[in-house]
Amino acid sequence: MLNILGRRNSSNVQKVLWVCDELHLSYEREDIGGTFGHNQSSKYLAMNPNGLVPTLIDNGRTLWESNAIVRYLCESREPHGLLPQDPWSIALAQQWMDWQQTTLGPAIRPLFRNLVRTAQQNRDLEVIAAGRNKTEAALRILDDHLSQHRYVTGNHFSFGDIPVGVMAYRWFNLDIQRAALPSLEDWYHRLTTHQAYRDNVMMTLS
């Protein structure tokens, strides 16, 4: 039995829950972080010294960093499911996972925090505008790629779609004006046909 430590409204936890349900893995989850706290306790820091979520416990072993957890689960539990079948496609999936962490995530994070987790009277409009512009610029890169591919690695859904798919839900559900990105929108709607996406990602932003 897998144990996942982390609150459901964390985008990084959502990645792990989504992949678990896609692979039909049994797990237990404990609310950690955010308003639930406990992520700075000595017990938790012994497992994840960053004090962040999620943390995965598998047979007494611990693993942190959400994208590493996603890769581990796909490689160890279901080698012919969400894991592409050739080294090039695996590398492409990893490329887009890394891009989510280094480019898309940092762009959308200030926008999300100001619009969702900050009282209206305390919101920084300049940060919101800059975040919207940076996120849109990043998503244009993905939109251009998806104009030639149904999913990030080609014609088949893979673990590479999961991190960017979580970010896409936030983008399409924030109260902002969005430029038309038709290939991105088509890909997003394909993701919404996945029950695991609806169950673990498509929730009220908080």
Predicted regions and their residues:
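GST-like fold's C-terminal all-alpha helical module
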Residues: 88, 100-193, 200
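Short, flexible loop/turn segments with low-complexity composition
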Residues: 199-206
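Compositionally biased amphipathic helical and low-complexity segments enriched in hydrophobic
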Residues: 24-26, 140, 182, 206
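Intrinsically disordered, low-complexity segments enriched in small/polar residues
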Residues: 25, 42, 70, 149, ...
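Structured helix-beta-strand junction loops
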Residues: 50, 76, 148-149, 194
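Conserved beta-strand edge residues that scaffold enzyme active sites
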Residues: 34-35, 160, 205
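GST-like domain detector, emphasizing the conserved glutathione-binding G-site
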Residues: 1-9, 14-129, 143
